[in-house]
Amino acid sequence: ELDQWETEAGQFVQAQYESALSMPDPQPADLLTHDFAPTPITEERGERAPKGAEPTVMVDAALFAIKELMAAHPEALLYGQDVGGRLGGVFREAATLAQKFGDERVFNTPIQEAFIIGSTVGMSATGLKPFVEVQFADYLWPGMNQLFTEVSRSYYLSNGKWPVSTVIRVPIGAYGSGGPFHSSSIETAVTSIRGIKIAYPSTGADLKGLMKSAFYDPNPVVIFEHKGLYWSKIPGTEGAKTPEPSEDYVIPFGKARTALEAEASTIAAGESAVVVTYGMGVYWAQKAAKAFPGQISILDLRTLAPWDRAAVMAEARTHGRVLVLTEECSSPSFAQSVQGAI
């Protein structure tokens, strides 16, 4: 019987090999096809600030988004290090979810980022929709091979058949006394990977809206969540706490928002400038802008892949002066690539 199986397997492989050889050569135009599957979220929908909604800290905005999605979609899972019922996440970002949805849908994993990220390929292929968490951005490196080789390329290599539908949450940035192992900003490394969408919101409303959009997007999405904005404890970051949007609120990727607008008179006089930034940079820019009243606009990118080129170029033309602000090292960086595009 084993010999028969071996013979049948050999015949199957040979037939597939001969079929592949008979295929026409790839065309150059095919090189850029199937990098992303079409998304159903193409415009902002729902209420961003419903009447009577209470101000919500950023970490809770994400928690409520996932809670709503898991209640509505039995295929949704959440797993990662310490997100299970005993702790509920080191930032309380998964609190109560295991108790509400059970250990089968919310569970801990080994301390192995390659497994956490790589497992989403199989989960997605079977029809599940995993939220996974890498506990700190500094810990993403062991999972980069899976992110680059498997997750980002599945849709392309399968000729548009198998996108990896997953949301990867990554707390990021310097906060508290994290030291060299809990403070890194690594968005440049991830933005260099084609086939992944990337969000980096600065407010609770944006985090919830982008979290919902990421879930309904068939492509892999990485969401960077700045630890220093989770509770708005850092002076000047109170703006990250926003009224909780409605359950159906979604934001399309690639659409920036204006966080501060210069006065028309200073723009007309040629005395204005725009700061293009994201995440914690929004609040650094707001603080600095107080020294230049009426002269500064702030454009919050909200998503880094894709980023809103049209809005950035329009602001550059309007003001003639652009400062791109990032927490990362300046060179090489994603911010530097934005500068280059301008």
Model features per residue range: what roles?
Residues 7-50:
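Terminal amphipathic helices with adjacent charged low-complexity linkers/tails
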Residues 1-18, 22, 32-224, 228-230, ...:
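Thiamine diphosphate
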